Amino acid sequence: MMNTEGNNGNKPLGLWNVVSIGIGAMVGAGIFALLGQAALLMEASTWVAFAFGGIVAMFSGYAYARLGASYPSNGGIIDFFRRGLGNGVFSLALSLLYLLTLAVSIAMVARAFGAYAVQFLHEGSQEEHLILLYALGIIAVMTLFNSLSNHAVGRLEVILVGIKMMILLLLIIAGVWSLQPAHISVSAPPSSGAFFSCIGITFLAYAGFGMMANAADKVKDPQVIMPRAFLVAIGVTTLLYISLALVLLSDVSALELEKYADTAVAQAASPLLGHVGYVIVVIGALLATASAINANLFAVFNIMDNMGSERELPKLMNKSLWRQSTWGNIIVVVLIMLMTAALNLGSLASVASATFLICYLAVFVVAIRLRHDIHASLPILIVGTLVMLLVIVGFIYSLWSQGSRALIWIIGSLLLSLIVAMVMKRNKTV
């Protein structure tokens, strides 16, 4: 883990450094995995869902920015829970839920990696066992990588952020020249169920903005820089997502979208950039998903280390097993693999979206409770809280009306986090 005291004598981070962290965290594997899923629900109106998702992220980013500016640390959301909600059962349950949310996100991204790998290496095939094989394989490889080295994660991400952005910008520029307005005109508004389902999924593509808060302790003037960084990073990402959605719906037919929803970005590249462009985008997607799994595993392991040092996990979880890995790391990885095998990409996206929304709603509660200390605007926080509540209720209702089994996993995640927290407190584990 990084030592944050005195910033290790390194030059403090400026505005564009923090913005780069935010864009890199948001514009990652999520867009490769989620764009097709969102387009299946909203079709020509997909860009509207990404725009609304960006607005929700802006409100949430405001709460995050004020907390990060006032309480700079590398603990991020876990530290916010402790400060605003104390060290009781509720705070611990939210920390466990956030940890579980990251685990579900890894499973989702692994599924996307498997889909792109099969599309690239077994053209025309959509065999489930092949997708699962590649998905489980990349989780195992990245777990091993994290067990051997901590230092390579950051450097790898910097390189891959540049590659991802260049590939996506190339796709957008090519798409603008061949944009077909008739394909992206909204003839009828989507149903409320489709709208809220899509908002929940698109918000997941923005969820990485929280990573900027983890860098607050390395910023020269966090009170000034953090709010600006959140605004710029989320704004740029929103424009990028809207552009990608317009390009996708303009050049990929509904039939292709239904068949290749998990690899929609690559399908959009084929008519725009030819076979070479298609190969470049697929390789970019594989690199993006692999690096996202790597970075998220790194985050999960560090959060577990942080929670262990605060005595918020059983001692066994932090007991060393091999190199830098612990028993807790292995238990979480096994859980991730089980979820990868049990749920498809769409269901995993729904579970991760719902639990992310709930965790970020809790950040609003923390910000409201600490509003005087963090110099936050109460009206903005209240509006943001109400918007987040509306999205959560609408998203859950849409899943219920569809009879989605993801709802069972969402409820199970909430109950599991709460029960484990209660048991740990009762047994004085923490």
From Swiss-Prot:
Family listed: Belongs to the amino acid-polyamine-organocation (APC) superfamily.
GO molecular function list: transmembrane transporter activity
Segments traversing the membrane: 15-35, 39-59, 89-109, 129-149, 158-178, 193-213, 229-249, 273-293, 326-346, 348-368, 380-400, 404-424
A Pfam family matched in the record: AA_permease_2
Protein name per its UniProtKB record: Inner membrane transport protein YbaT
Location in the cell: Cell inner membrane
Main location, first listed in the record: membrane
Function: Probable amino-acid or metabolite transport protein.
Domain of life of the organism encoding this protein: Bacteria
Classification via InterPro entries: AA/rel_permease1, APC_superfamily
Signal sequence interval, chain numbering: none
Cysteine disulfide links: none
Record membrane topology: Multi-pass membrane protein
Gene3D superfamilies referenced in this protein's UniProt entry, alphabetically: Amino acid/polyamine transporter I
GO terms under biological process: amino acid transport; response to pH; stress response to copper ion
Keywords assigned: Amino-acid transport, Cell inner membrane, Cell membrane, Membrane, Transmembrane, Transmembrane helix, Transport
Species this protein is from: Escherichia coli (strain K12)
Residue ranges that the UniProt entry lists as topological domain Periplasmic: 36-38, 110-128, 179-192, 250-272, 347, 401-403
Residues on Cytoplasmic side: 1-14, 60-88, 150-157, 214-228, 294-325, 369-379, 425-430
Gene symbol of the encoding locus: ybaT
GO cellular component, one term: plasma membrane
UniProt lineage: Bacteria, Pseudomonadati, Pseudomonadota, Gammaproteobacteria, Enterobacterales
